[in-house]
Regions:
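Low-complexity repeat regions of mature extracellularly deployed or surface/particle-associated proteins
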Residues: 2-222
Length: 222
């Protein structure tokens, strides 16, 4: 399965702000070229209503054991331009746990995406995990682009391109969290346009010597 270009490694939970903006600008430039190329395609009939785009991206991570760590990052950005609107986003969640008792460590991570009103959706998703006698880890990451070309729609409905890596692989992991129980989560959402919406929700919970949990969502509409 080919890996999409310039995806960020899940090892870095928080990237520098200018990196995010540069990625957003590159995808905007791609959308402008793409929208111009398809300008002469099939159009809606005159008088038909135009609906905007809305996208929700998020995920969660949980770890159980004496020492646990969960991290989450959600980013969602939207812009309404002349002739098209575009939304880009990602979600990266990781969990790791360690226990002195064999089989006492568990870890899970997952991501999700829901998009409405887009003509084209490109989504890349990957999940992995490891399980050893005294430790466990899991990671899940998702990247996507959603594009709506105003006054045009694909004849057969939205075009969705999904790129996936194989599912979880459980094997001795070697991942060891720091002593203690930690939970870190960040969510960012931003939208630009005449009628727009952006919102985020985050939760983080730790229980000493037992558990760590994070979840987050980012919502944008244009």
């Amino acid at each position: 399965m080919p890996t999409p270009p310039k995806v960020k490694s899940s090892a870095s939970i928080v990237g520098e702000p200018h990196d995010v903006l540069e990625l957003f600008e590159r995808r905007i430039e791609w959308a402008e070229r793409f929208g111009a190329h398809h300008g002469g395609a099939k159009h809606h009939e005159a008088g038909s209503s135009e609906e905007g785009q809305i996208a929700v991206v998020g995920g969660n991570a949980a770890a159980a054991g004496q020492d646990t760590l969960t991290t989450g990052l959600v980013q969602n950005f939207a812009a309404d331009k002349d002739g098209y609107s575009i939304i880009v986003g990602d979600a990266i969640f990781e969990a790791s746990a360690q226990s002195p008792e064999p089989g006492g460590a568990t870890a899970t991570a997952s991501t999700f995406l829901a998009v409405s009103g887009a003509d084209f959706i490109i989504e890349y998703e990957s999940s992995h995990g490891g399980l050893g006698p005294n430790d466990a880890w899991a990671s899940s990451e998702l990247y996507y682009v959603a594009l709506d070309i105003k006054g045009w729609s694909p004849g057969g409905g939205p075009v969705v391109i999904e790129l996936h890596q194989p599912g979880h692989h459980f094997q001795p992991s070697g991942h060891q969290p720091s002593d203690g129980n930690y939970a870190h989560v960040i969510a960012r959402a931003e939208s630009h346009g005449a009628d727009n919406l952006s919102a985020t929700l985050t939760n983080a919970l730790t229980i000493e010597n037992q558990f760590s949990f994070v979840n987050a969502i980012g919502v944008v509409a244009v």
